């Protein structure tokens, strides 16, 4: 792996009906931003080969929306370890990824 892209989840919907913070979905604005970022990264030739994302609904939705808009087809690993993770925990998760990818996106 040579490049790591850090992508923050899109704007979440505080008005949605959700139980716990972990279940909060993207707002329409967040979906639009994720699509825009997916297309941007593809246009910039920064298409991720692999993805690593938090199990939070808004993070998974951000990744799925960006990937669809950008035409990304690489595998994704969803992990609870990234939800509310410390910088050290994020680094451990990145280090656990395989080296066969040139570009990894972390959401």
Where are these predicted regions, by residue range?
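Generic beta-sheet signal
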Residues: 4, 97-106
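Surface-exposed beta-strand edges and their flanking turn/coil or helix-capping segments
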Residues: 19-20, 91-93, 107
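Active-site-proximal alpha-helix that buttresses catalytic centers in soluble enzyme cores
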Residues: 2-3, 7-80, 85
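Short phosphate-binding loop-to-helix
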Residues: 82-100
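Short, well-ordered coil↔helix boundary/capping segments
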Residues: 84, 106-107
């Amino acid at each position: 792996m040579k490049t790591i892209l850090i992508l923050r989840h899109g704007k979440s919907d505080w008005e949605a009906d959700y139980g716990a913070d972990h279940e909060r979905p993207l707002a329409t604005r967040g979906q639009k931003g994720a699509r825009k970022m997916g297309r941007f990264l593809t246009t910039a030739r920064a298409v991720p080969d692999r993805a690593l994302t938090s199990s939070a609904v808004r993070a998974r939705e951000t990744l799925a929306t960006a990937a669809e808009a950008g035409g990304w087809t690489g595998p994704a690993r969803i992990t609870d370890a990234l939800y509310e993770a410390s910088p050290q925990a994020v680094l451990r998760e990145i280090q656990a990824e395989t080296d066969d990818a040139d570009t990894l996106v972390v959401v």
